[in-house]
């Protein structure tokens, strides 16, 4: 019998620190908000890990029949340094350009990197600078509830007042008294009642470029406010999933919860999902430590974008992932393997149509529908268990090996089961976010002829073999032995033997 296919989706909820069965607010629909980048510099692969993980989560939810509304913001104003200066404005001063030029440059760069990694576009990608009016309205609501105060043109969230009715620090489980004793006094904080109060609105001096009019004077919104405002606008005051990197738990997400409770009296999201960090030589990858790795550099070094995506998914999202060259090399090989498996499915289809498998391989074991259903269930169950991508990839490798057995004529399959096998493989490859077209285009023209020429027309197989052999001869003539050996080995897998005369 096929394996049990009725397991629920279990999600680790950072709010409760345990796995919980996922139950959406509205059956069949999922509202998800993921904190996007602050666009003051190029995103490195440690930043990109979060967005690749949530891309897979969205793909899986959609494969399970959910209609997902995915919101991912762009922070183009309001992310403050410890000295109270906006990060984007600070970078603009260094480069002597307009702040929005910095924001636009790195927003475009971020989107291009996610395109290369085959990430789906969010349904809405709001800019913080495009929601100033709504953020001012949020501040007014918090003030009206008594949880914020104005001080010399700035507005701060009153954590002491908030603590009388709610718990602050639910996600990080930070002890507020420890925070108070360990918070250093900064010049920019002198107007606060308490050093741990956070800014909802910051007064801007006359030289500040990124500023807007407000009831409290010219200024700009605080970083934490934008996500509360925009998630509420596009998903409502209570939605299903809020995601982001683990480093956002405190203070950003704790502050979001506080703001939402101050305005609406309830937490914004039912499930909080946090991705862990990427390290390099066991040290956190960050701009401040100078050990960042850029996607463009890795691609220029010869790694497939698919491979980088596979690497970022190779560890469970809640685990620390350490970068090393061997792991990336292995991911590169695996990307090639999955593409070869896709190609092999086409070969099997051609051979079935020509009756070659039935004639030559009729005494070999026949893979059954139940076996294929079990493979499908194993892949699905891996992701039902808190999006366990290492297990999911492992099951896909098993599936790939099964297809290898068929193409190597160690296992037989009928046409109906082949169609189902192809459906399974393509479905899970899509959930993985594997970009077949991108992988194909990265092969050289010679490699394409060698790898894919046979699948187009069995009727002209002799002509195609002649062309492929000519390509191989030209490769040998210019001492391109990697390509010539590649062609020989690939043809050998198809049952064709090439003997070199020299």
What is each of the regions a protein language model found here?
Residues 92-98, 123-129, 245:
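The substrate-binding groove and active-site-proximal loops of carbohydrate-active enzymes
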Residues 1-40, 55, 112, 133-347:
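Alpha-helical recognition segments enriched in aromatics with Gly/Pro capping
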Residues 71-77, 105-110, 120-135, 153-162:
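Short, glycine/charge-rich beta-strand/loop segments that flank catalytic centers
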Residues 292-502:
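Structural preference for alpha-helix termini/caps and helix-kink/transition segments
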Residues 16-19, 25-118, 138, 498-500:
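N-terminal, positively charged nucleic-acid-binding surface of large information/translation enzymes
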